[in-house]
Structures are given as C-alpha cells and as structure tokens.
Amino acid sequence: MNDSEFHQLADQLMLCIEETLDGFSGDSDIDYETNGGVMTLTFENGSKIVINRQEPLHQVWLATKAGGYHFDYREGHWYCSRSGEEFFTKLSEAATAQAGEVVSFS
C-alpha cells in the first residue's frame, strides 16, 4: 500500500465513524472532533477515545480507557496487530463501555 491508498482508506474509516455518531440515537452524548488526522470522541463522563493515523507505518491507532491498539489494513478491513480483532468490533466494545450503553460501529 502506498501513502495515497493509506490516506484514502483512513479517510473512509473516519467518515464511517462520523456518520455513525451523527446518526446515534442513544441517550448518551458523544461528541467528536477531527484535527490533523486525529479524531477524538468525548463521552458524557469525560472519558475519551482517540483514533489517529500513523502514516509511516500505514496503521490506524486506537486509544481507549482499556488500552492502546494498532490496526493494519488487510483483506478489506482494519485488524489489530496483536489480537487480530477487527477495528469496528474493538471500537464498539470500547465506546459501549465508556458510554454506558450500546454503541455499534460497522
């Protein structure tokens, strides 16, 4: 993958997250802000999830209350470099824990 392909895939990922949050109809208030390739989700309880691009590695990194995760793109999805877990599965799990209600990304 070259840098251009990486940016296109990372942009698609961020857009999908934005669209999910814009359409979220739960009780929790989840705000997001994107600045310089870094997306920060802020929850009512003050906790945050940070998603950022690591261009030199062609990875997307996810930082949650539970820990940090690095994701590589393969076979049409972003997968954790340690556990093999898919990005949206891990993000949904973390957002649900931090929001106190089900938040589902796909």
Swiss-Prot record:
The keyword Chaperone does not apply. It holds the Pfam family Frataxin_Cyay. GO terms for molecular function: ferric iron binding; ferrous iron binding. Keywords: Iron, Metal-binding. InterPro entries: CyaY, Frataxin/CyaY, Frataxin/CyaY_sf, Frataxin_CS. The keyword Iron applies. SMART domains: Frataxin_Cyay. GO terms for cellular component: cytosol. GO terms for biological process: iron-sulfur cluster assembly. SUPFAM superfamilies: Frataxin/Nqo15-like. Involved in iron-sulfur (Fe-S) cluster assembly. May act as a regulator of Fe-S biogenesis. Belongs to the frataxin family. PANTHER family: FRATAXIN, FRATAXIN, MITOCHONDRIAL. NCBIfam families: FeS_CyaY (TIGR03421). This is Iron-sulfur cluster assembly protein CyaY. The gene is cyaY.
